[in-house]
């Protein structure tokens, strides 16, 4: 063993005569694969690389040691690192610690990277901003919010920070939904003497949009301009997307116009975002104008672009045009993906062309794609809409054979079909089956069942289900309340209907026009014109104008009451 160790040192003595990079390259060549390293040989090599400022190569060498690619009978990775951190001079040791930390970050070893960071600080060294930011990015991405927040606050006085350090933290806060903390960091950033940049403002705008705080996002955007920061295409895109997703569509399109007026060209993501909203609004023609504009400007389309347009056309039932877009995407070298196929299958199911939908399903399989749970749910729904429960059952059987378990959505589609076809016994049986499989019925499942019982006038059954869902912490929504109110009104039970209306008001849920009309009608039949008038006042307060027929009902009820009182 001593002879091998001596041979290693002799070889290294010759290698150090070469420039550091040449020596490193030689050691990584096939001729040196049987080379037996020692503590000393690695130490010499690292010192050589660090002295030449070849930090990435030093890191590469350590990564090979950590991963076991460089192994030796003379050391383990832990014994080697202990030797290195104990034996090097102060200047080399500082650089060495940073390389060790970076290496463990790159190898995704959270505990060891933090351990060597702590050791570095305990030895009196102050990690530079590059090293700390690299570690901080890893810690933020690999830990819970509370863990990395504590890590930063415990160490911020022990390291060199820069504006990028705060950028990493602000992004982490926004992704964790901790918007207030991100604004605290913005203040702290300035206290450290730094100025926020466009990236930080863009991150904050995106975070506010995702949290639904759209006014804050807009304020930040205009604050940027006052500070002399020029919004880039990403800044505009996240704000436009946020405005759309928060229902402020008009302002979203205005921001898109402003972007171009300010000389900022939309990128692929901006165009996709705008086209998506236009398609959702049923403005597919306008979406294609945007599509033509992006192509004229030389912006390359991607699969999302085409899927967006195909989805818009399918929603408008323009399936022949959707097929033409598929042909165009293929000619542009973009192959349809599962989303493309699911969109088309849904479109053809929507117009009752199940044969074409099944043909598309076969086509996607022939192209090496696998139908997903979504694919099968679309097909099951398509068969159910046509009243073909045996076809739906075949789809369920096929999905199970392919190892795809029916989901809550699958069962709810089937339950809805049987409930609407007046087969409540089968609908309830399916609900019990899904519960046996561990699938908990959600508000939509209960909604279709309650609707089925209400249509049949079986209000006792509907009431039992209503109570059951409340007991199971499944909160009834507006649809269920309105369905129950209509059911009780048809039964002539104004007391129960009004009781549910009161519950809705307490939960800040809104009765619909039909609920108001049926309740007023029942109250008028019971000659309770004053209660009916109070409901009309509630209608007006909630922004619903009572129709002429409702006002006529009350007028007749009042006349009847007046006549009977005589």
Swiss-Prot record:
The PPR repeat ranges on this chain: 93-127, 128-158, 162-196, 197-231, 232-266, 267-301, 302-336, 337-371, 372-406, 407-441, 442-476, 477-511, 512-546
Pfam families reported in the protein's UniProt record: PPR, PPR_1, PPR_2
Keyword Lipid metabolism: no
GO BP terms, alphabetized: mitochondrial mRNA modification; response to abscisic acid
Keywords in alphabetical order: Repeat
GO cellular component annotations of the record: mitochondrion
Highest taxon of the lineage: Eukaryota
Family matches, as InterPro entries: Pentatricopeptide_rpt (IPR002885), PPR/CCM1_RNA-binding (IPR051222), TPR-like_helical_dom_sf (IPR011990)
Assigned protein family: Belongs to the PPR family. P subfamily.
Entries under NCBIfam families matching the protein: PPR (TIGR00756)
Protein name per the record: Pentatricopeptide repeat-containing protein At4g11690
């Amino acid at each position: 063993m001593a002879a091998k160790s001596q041979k290693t040192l002799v070889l290294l003595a010759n290698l150090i005569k070469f420039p550091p990079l040449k020596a490193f390259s030689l050691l990584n060549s096939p001729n040196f694969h049987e080379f037996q390293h020692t503590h000393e040989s690695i130490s010499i090599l690292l010192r050589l690389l660090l002295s030449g400022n070849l930090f990435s190569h030093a890191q590469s060498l350590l990564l090979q040691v950590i991963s076991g690619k460089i192994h030796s009978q003379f050391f383990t990775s832990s014994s080697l690192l202990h030797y290195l951190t104990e034996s090097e001079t102060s200047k080399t040791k500082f650089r060495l610690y940073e390389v060790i930390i970076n290496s463990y970050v790159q190898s995704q070893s959270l505990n060891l990277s933090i351990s060597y960071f702590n050791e570095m600080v305990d030895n009196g060294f102050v990690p530079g901003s590059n090293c700390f930011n690299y570690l901080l990015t890893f810690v933020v991405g690999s830990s819970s919010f509370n863990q990395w927040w504590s890590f930063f606050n415990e160490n911020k006085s022990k390291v060199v920070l820069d504006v990028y350090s705060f950028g990493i933290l602000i992004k982490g806060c926004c992704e964790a939904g901790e918007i207030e903390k991100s604004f605290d960091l913005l203040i702290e950033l300035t206290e450290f003497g730094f100025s926020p940049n466009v990236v930080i403002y863009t991150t904050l705008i995106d975070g506010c949009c995702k949290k639904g705080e759209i006014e804050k996002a807009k304020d930040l955007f205009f604050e940027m301009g006052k500070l002399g920061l020029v919004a880039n295409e990403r800044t505009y895109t996240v704000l436009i997307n946020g405005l759309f997703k928060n229902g402020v569509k008009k302002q979203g399109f205005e921001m898109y116009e402003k972007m171009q007026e300010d000389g900022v060209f939309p990128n692929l993501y901006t165009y996709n975002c705008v086209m998506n909203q236009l398609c959702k609004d049923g403005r597919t023609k306008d979406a294609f104008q945007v599509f033509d504009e992006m192509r004229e400007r030389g912006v390359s389309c991607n699969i999302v672009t085409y899927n967006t347009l195909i989805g818009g056309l399918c929603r408008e039932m323009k399936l022949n045009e959707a097929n033409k877009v598929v042909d165009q995407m293929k000619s542009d070298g973009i192959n349809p993906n599962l989303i493309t196929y699911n969109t088309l299958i849904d479109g053809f199911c929507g117009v009752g062309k199940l044969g074409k939908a099944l043909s598309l399903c076969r086509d996607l399989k022939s192209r090496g794609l696998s139908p997903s749970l979504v694919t099968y749910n679309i097909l099951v729904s398509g068969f159910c809409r046509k009243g073909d429960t045996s076809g739906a059952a075949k789809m369920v059987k096929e999905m199970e054979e392919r190892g795809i378990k029916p989901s809550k959505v699958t069962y709810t589609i089937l339950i809805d079909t049987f409930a609407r076809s007046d087969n409540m016994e089968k609908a309830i049986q399916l609900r019990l089956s899904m519960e046996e499989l561990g699938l908990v019925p959600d508000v939509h499942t209960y909604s279709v069942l309650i609707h089925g019982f209400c249509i049949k006038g079986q209000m006792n059954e509907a009431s039992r289900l209503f109570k059951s869902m409340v007991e199971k912490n499944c909160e009834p929504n507006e649809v269920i309340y309105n369905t129950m109110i209509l059911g009780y009104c048809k039964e002539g039970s104004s007391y129960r209907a009004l009781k549910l209306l009161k519950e809705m008001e307490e939960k800040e849920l809104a009765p619909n026009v039909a609920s108001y009309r049926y309740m007023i009608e029942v109250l008028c039949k019971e000659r309770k014109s004053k209660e009916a008038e109070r409901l009309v006042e509630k209608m007006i307060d909630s922004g619903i104008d009572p129709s002429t027929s409702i006002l006529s009902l009350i007028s007749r009820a009042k006349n009847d009451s007046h006549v009977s009182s005589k």
